[in-house]
């Protein structure tokens, strides 16, 4: 292992000083055991693997940084992360959660997808497990009082952001192709509500099985739908709306073979933003770059740049690409969980632990910014960055092309790293 550099230590101190001054830890209330164990359900394989792999690295850094911090303040405790691969599969996620439960784990970071969260929710709710997903955004999972917390805002805001962009781009009708699960259907619902309210049209969504690996029939239907619309609208007024996980790369790789869908713009969604598989596929990345494909995702807080900047650099050095924002929300979730245990001890009942977690989240300002939760246990604040693929001399890279402020409803274009209203 390389020696810790002064710059690294400075970054860690900066990351937590602003939070620590607000925290009220009880000196006489040490955890009942020196090792605090936290579970992590990650999509290390399957269609969510791009996010899972970057999150695995980020929470590994969280464990390192936490233990260094605990040692620096003389605290007789350490954190240990137990990581399980859900394979981006609902049944596997539940299986692994039950294993964690039998191991005495009562705080779990993850899983990645809303479908997985939905699958494990009944068990978590009835067995006193707090689940903190860094990435689940389905609107229907915004439920007050349950044991599911989420470190991102629900897709209500994503629907607003996408609709704003579509209207400003003069798109009048969208033809969705979506993953047929709770996330895909909820996101389509949120976007449809906002887009139709702005005068837009949603035309004949094409839905596919989340386990599908070939998309010939879906692309044929999508192409036929666009062909029908071309009798009424110009190509510049029509867009394909892709709501996918990593399988979107396979869809884009084949899309160029269909004459009508390649004549219109494409728009993406949060689960595909910054996806690592897209840049590795020549056909898919070329199609994405030439057809726009802006993908909105929970945005970075500029006021937290001194925190997410160094962390992003560390993750990038480890995985060879820029991480998505969910790696940062996962990192922060581990920290808030640890600080909650320092406040409550490890034997607190679930109601006490949830209340303390909510308080700690409200007082924490980390790599992803302010982590205050709303009444549903979801992130209370959230702007969106739009990422799209752009070509440079070394290949294709994800770059921010626009930002949406949920408080003001303003969409700001980003051109050559300059904000343009």
Question: Can you annotate each of these PLM segments?
Answer:
Residues 138-140, 144-257, 301-306, 310:
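Extracellular/periplasmic Venus flytrap/periplasmic-binding protein
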Residues 51-69, 92, 158, 182-202, ...:
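Short, solvent-exposed amphipathic alpha-helices that sit
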Residues 25-26, 31, 37, 50-57, ...:
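Beta-alpha junction/loop-to-helix N-cap segments that form part of ligand/metal-binding clefts
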Residues 40, 100-113, 132-134, 175-178, ...:
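Periplasmic-binding protein-like
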Residues 314-328, 338-400:
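Segments of small-molecule ligand-sensing domains
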Residues 15-18:
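C-terminal motif of bacterial Sec signal peptides marking the signal peptidase cleavage site
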Residues 20-24:
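Bacterial signal peptide processing site
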Residues 252-331, 344, 411-420:
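Extracellular/periplasmic periplasmic-binding protein-like sensory domains
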